[in-house]
Curated annotation (Swiss-Prot):
Residues 621-689 form the S1 motif domain. Involved in mRNA degradation. Catalyzes the phosphorolysis of single-stranded polyribonucleotides processively in the 3'- to 5'-direction. The lineage of its organism: Bacteria, Pseudomonadati, Pseudomonadota, Gammaproteobacteria, Alteromonadales. The keyword Transferase applies. This is Polyribonucleotide nucleotidyltransferase. Its cofactor is Mg(2+). Residues 552-611 form the KH domain. GO terms for biological process: mRNA catabolic process; RNA processing. InterPro entries: ExoRNase_PH_dom1, ExoRNase_PH_dom2, ExoRNase_PH_dom2_sf, KH_dom, KH_dom_type_1, KH_dom_type_1_sf, NA-bd_OB-fold, PNPase. It is found in: Cytoplasm.
């Protein structure tokens, strides 16, 4: 075994790429390390293309092994199971920038598997996983127009930080991942604390500049490995068939794309394509139907793009910077804690907000450690939203990714636990879709949170931008349709407030997207965002003063930390009885903080009263209403507070001499007693005689 190793300094860490020792039967395998965080990346491709396949079957699997952090998995089986949400998001993060780097026409199956085998809790595996993937693909011999670089950028005290540690990110106003080739940015994913557009763009440029050292190192590794490239050539286009397809379908497609309503337009496009295909197959029955479909798709793309570049109105008749018609409603569902219906053209999101207690928070156990998330956002994309049938069940990768993007857009304006001690779950149901449903979810979430009475800092809106570029000519499109997303060169989603950007996601399919183009897109997005915020503010411009009557109201009180055990009781008996009898949820913290949650105000008051009784201190000189619990020859034991008994000596029962206690008292009798003394052992001495002059009993 002859290892080939390449090391370089990258930000605060040393990156090492090694190949030739592990997983040698794969087309390529790279052991990539950043500090003590190490991933094994393997690439395998099938040499033979499956006949009739009309798509590129690339699979990216990212898996975190618990042994990497020195842990044993939980659960009955004690082994890793299905991918977590975090693993799914990382797999998407890697897939997005590498997919456009495979050549057009390449349809051989390729599988990339990234396995985290060692982890430093201060160094997240995402960046080194992307670097390792780029290196493995570059040395595999598989057609790949890389290499690709990757960087994470933080922003602290007005300075950009390259590949910040987990601790540094806690104080950072920005967490931005950027990936690209030597000449082009391909992917951006970020979350920010409402930063100005120029700071966001500066972070993208900074990250792309810094990752050049990665690209250079991978080039050197590729030269040293020197593996022969696959003998693959792009399929030759049948120019005669291209001309026939154009003659038969171009005019019809041009007309079809002037139909504004999506479903009607799709129906007409299908009519045109079917007629052209049938005519070509009638002329030549041996023609490849899939090839015809591909050429019709290419022609469709060309028709739409050429109209936009020529300055004609867009598919639905809008100008490039126009946002579709908006409809905004808050409080649309009667029993939810908060709800909103946000409609932008043919994209619609029904968003609900549910408030819960701290025990409803999501507990995340990953190799980076345990975390608790009080704010959850789930995105659902049912098939009916696009007029189709399909499977309904657990969320797919896309739904998880879109939900996380919307979460990032809102997270910066969420209140702290001290400001609002609730767990919050938002669900966005996409009921109609024609482009930018994740950004509709951002708008709907902002509205639903305010309707629920959540004190978010300010409203947030999101917009999806697109780009069509031919040579030096380009047009930036605001609020793109699904077709414009599919046929365009860039998908550029921006969420933010009036003051700045909270989330930015960018996927670029071509080279040549300059800083100036991105600047224009960000400025155009700002104008669209402010327009949407103005419309949203007409429906609801601030959070409701009161939370819903159906939501649990959380009341917080403080008790002596030494009294926590009294509230819990033996084996939890006291707190269990409290919650069952009052119908409340009670949470105790080590510092003596007690949180009582209930939608019923009277139940909350009763729980508070009983907790105060349990935790109250016996005060010397105070008169209590007590209950006789036991009679003995020398007096009676009286309960004055829950769990606190005192002795009334026979001499303290009455002014006159008492010969027999039972003549004056019986078990269960309520009496007024005054606390005379509490000795060092906590024993309480009571007197009925001394309590008699008191007109009122002390109430605790």
């Amino acid at each position: 075994m002859n290892p080939i190793v390449k090391s370089f300094e990258y930000g605060q860490h040393t990156v090492t790429l090694e190949t030739g020792v592990i997983a040698r039967q794969a087309d390529a395998a790279v052991l990539a390390s950043m500090g003590d965080t190490t991933v094994l990346v393997t690439v395998v491709g099938k040499k033979a293309e499956e006949p009739g396949r009309d798509f590129f079957p690339l699979t990216v699997n990212y898996q975190e092994k618990t042994y990497a952090a020195g842990k044993i998995p939980g659960g009955f089986f004690k082994r890793e199971g299905r991918p977590s949400e975090g693993e799914t998001l990382t797999a998407r993060l890697i897939d997005r920038p590498i997919r456009p780097l495979f050549p057009n026409g390449f349809k051989n199956e390729v599988q990339v598997i990234i396995t985290v085998v060692s982890v430093d809790p201060e160094i997240s595996p995402e960046v080194i996983s992307m670097i390792g993937t780029s290196a493995a693909l570059s040395i595999s011999g598989i057609p790949f127009n890389g290499p690709l670089g990757s960087a994470r950028v933080g922003y602290v005290d007005g300075e950009y930080i390259l590949n910040p540690t987990v601790s540094q990110l806690e104080n950072s106003q920005l967490e931005l991942s950027v990936a690209g080739t030597e000449n082009a940015v391909l992917m951006v994913e970020s979350e920010a604390d409402a930063l100005p557009e120029e700071v966001m763009l500066g972070a993208v440029v900074y990250g792309h500049e810094q990752q050049q050292v990665v690209i250079q190192a991978i080039k050197e590794l590729k030269a040293e490995v020197n593996k022969p490239m696959w003998d693959w050539t792009a399929p030759v286009q049948n120019e005669e068939l291209v001309a026939k397809v154009k003659d038969l379908a171009e005019a019809g497609l041009t007309e079809a794309y002037q139909i504004v309503v999506k479903q009607d337009r799709y129906a007409q496009v299908d009519v045109v394509k079917t007629a052209a295909k049938e005519a070509l197959l009638a002329e030549n029955p041996d023609a490849d139907a899939r090839e015809i479909d591909g050429l019709l798709g290419s022609l469709e793309k060309k028709v739409v793009r050429s109209r936009i570049i020529a300055g004609n109105p867009r598919i639905d008749g809008r100008e490039p910077d126009m946002v579709r018609a908006l409809s905004v409603m808050a409080g649309v569902l009667p029993r939810t804690h908060g709800s909103a219906l946000f409609t932008r053209g043919e994209t619609q999101a029904l968003v609900t907000c549910t408030l819960g207690t701290e025990r409803d928070a999501q507990k995340i156990d990953s190799i980076m450690g345990e975390q608790t998330s009080r704010f959850m956002l789930h995105y659902n994309f049912p098939p009916y939203s696009v007029g189709e049938t399909g499977m309904v069940g657990s969320p797919k990768r896309r739904e998880i990714g879109h939900g996380k993007l919307a979460w990032r857009g809102i997270h910066a304006v969420m209140p702290t636990a001290e400001e609002f001690p609730y767990s919050i779950r938002v669900v966005s149901e996409i009921t109609e879709s024609n482009g930018s449903s994740s950004m509709a979810s951002v708008c709907g979430t902002s509205l639903a949170l305010m309707d629920a009475g959540v004190p978010i800092k300010t409203s947030v809106a999101g917009i999806a931008m697109g780009l069509v570029k031919e040579g030096d000519d380009f047009v930036v499109l605001s609020d793109i349709l699904g077709d414009e997303d599919h046929l365009g060169d860039m998908d550029f989603k921006v969420a933010g407030t009036r003051d700045g950007v909270t989330a930015l996601q960018m996927d670029i399919k071509i080279e040549g997207i300059t800083k100036e183009i991105m600047q224009i897109a960000l400025q155009q997005a700002y104008g669209a965002r402010v327009h949407i915020l103005n419309v949203m503010d007409q429906a609801i411009s601030g959070h409701r003063a009161e939370i819903s009557d159906h939501a649990p109201r959380i009341t917080t009180l403080k008790i002596n930390p030494e009294k926590i055990r009294d509230v819990i009781g033996k084996g939890g008996a006291t707190i269990r009885a409290l919650t069952e009898e009052t119908g409340t949820t009670i949470e105790l913290e080590d510092d003596g903080t007690v949180k009582i949650a209930s939608a019923n105000g009277d139940a909350t008051k009763e729980a508070i009263r009983r907790i105060q009784e349990i935790t109250a201190e016996v005060e010397v000189g105070t008169v209590y209403n007590g209950k006789v619990v036991r009679i003995v020859d020398f007096g009676a034991f009286v309960t004055i507070l829950p769990g606190k008994d005192g002795l009334v000596h026979i001499s303290q029962i009455a002014e006159e001499r008492v010969a027999n206690v039972s003549d004056y008292l019986e078990v269960g009798q309520e009496v007024k007693v005054k606390v005379m003394e509490v000795d060092r052992q906590g024993r309480v001495r009571l007197s009925m005689k001394e309590a008699q002059p008191k007109e009122e009993a002390a109430s605790e």
